[in-house]
């Protein structure tokens, strides 16, 4: 019973030690095609050796069943070289190529049955052999070099390229939606402003219109028509005419005593344009700029509302700085900022008591 127990172990050892037999049908540089039952050329299927000092393995590393049992190429034997991508190596000294065995190879041995070690710069990695085993045998007349792993690189690049294109498309669509939303929002704002002030010219009169209106009541209108752009240099008499002849000689401080007129001017000039409010051509802020006060002063004066009127503070400031300031100068500034309504209220202080039509 002892020898029988050692029989399976001996069979395994013999199977491992049994050399790989070459093709029983084809020569060394050929392989057996079991589908067509003929011998194919290793050169036509795999092409010449890709690197120097390599030659074809026996039967291209294929057995008669079409299985890849080793790599198609192997290193040259010691003392032989292959610089011209020939099928087999030759003597390094320029000798003839080693003879090529042909015909049936019934179990003949090979020069090297050990795995071929890696060699730079063209290593023969085991990963390439695993790729070879998954390929179907091709016809002898069609060369095939698809056993290299580099051919899978374009297939791996497709998913990342598709994702990048999808991301760019999403960004473009999102940007277009945002732009359309902004355009609609601006259109709605413009429509709202148009509805709120359908006739801006009626709310805020043009400066030239008031200029022509005041010039018509003056006997020297033709002479003053050439000086529309220099309001400060134009005297009060040609501008206001016979309706308010005494305003130019009255001090501005009188307005502080005429509380009724002052309150009407405050109601007209202090409010500023805003949402839902009346739009005005000129406010107390614009009037202060005509008197040469900085914008910071106007901001401070408006910050005191409603406990203190900015217009009243402006008149007190001008009277304190320039006691000789007159109502005529105030009327000129009101005409400059296009406030005919305020001019009509100011005309109540005239000796005639007439109002602008």
Curated annotation (Swiss-Prot):
Task: Kindly report every residue range on the membrane side named Cytoplasmic.
Answer: 182-357
Q: Where are the bilayer-spanning segments?
A: 161-181
Q: Got a GO cellular component term for this one?
A: plasma membrane
Which terms are listed as keywords in the entry?
Cell membrane, Membrane, Receptor, Signal, Transmembrane, Transmembrane helix
User: Extracellular side of the membrane: what ranges?
Assistant: 23-160
Tell where it localizes: Cell membrane
Which PANTHER family does the entry mention? IGF-LIKE FAMILY RECEPTOR 1
Protein's UniProt name? IGF-like family receptor 1
Native species:
Bos taurus
């Amino acid at each position: 019973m002892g020898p029988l127990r050692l029989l399976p172990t001996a069979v395994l050892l013999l199977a491992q030690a049994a050399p790989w037999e070459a093709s029983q049908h084809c020569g060394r540089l050929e392989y057996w095609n079991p589908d067509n039952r003929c011998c194919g050329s290793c050169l036509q299927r795999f092409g010449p050796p890709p690197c120097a000092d390599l030659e074809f393995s026996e039967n291209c590393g294929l057995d008669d069943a079409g299985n890849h049992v080793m790599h198609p190429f192997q290193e040259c034997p010691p003392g032989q070289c292959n610089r011209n991508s020939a099928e087999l190596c030759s003597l390094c000294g320029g000798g003839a190529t080693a003879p090529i065995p042909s015909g049936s190879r019934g179990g003949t041995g090979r020069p090297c049955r050990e795995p071929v070690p890696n060699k730079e710069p063209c290593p023969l990695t085991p990963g390439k052999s695993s790729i070879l085993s998954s390929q179907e045998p091709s016809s002898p007349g069609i060369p095939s070099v698809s056993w290299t792993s580099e051919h899978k690189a374009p297939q791996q690049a497709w998913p990342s390229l598709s994702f990048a294109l999808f991301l760019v498309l999403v960004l473009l669509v999102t940007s277009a939606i945002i732009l359309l939303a902004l355009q609609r929002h601006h259109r709605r704002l413009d429509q709202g402003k148009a509805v709120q002030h359908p006739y801006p010219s009626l709310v805020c009169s043009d400066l030239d219109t008031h200029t022509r209106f005041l010039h018509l009541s003056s006997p020297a209108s033709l002479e003053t028509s050439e000086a529309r752009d220099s309001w400060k240099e134009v005297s009060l008499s040609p501008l206001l005419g016979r309706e308010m002849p005494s305003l130019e000689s009255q001090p501005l401080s009188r307005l502080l005593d005429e509380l009724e007129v002052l309150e009407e001017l405050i109601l007209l000039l202090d409010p500023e344009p805003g949402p839902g409010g009346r739009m005005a051509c000129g406010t107390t802020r614009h009037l202060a700029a005509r008197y040469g006060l900085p914008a910071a002063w106007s901001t401070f004066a408006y910050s005191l509302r409603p406990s203190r009127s900015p217009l009243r503070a402006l008149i007190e400031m001008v009277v304190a700085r320039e006691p000789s300031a007159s109502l005529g100068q105030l009327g000129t500034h009101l005409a400059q900022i296009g406030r005919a309504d305020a001019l009509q209220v100011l005309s109540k202080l005239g000796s005639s008591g007439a109002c602008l039509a």
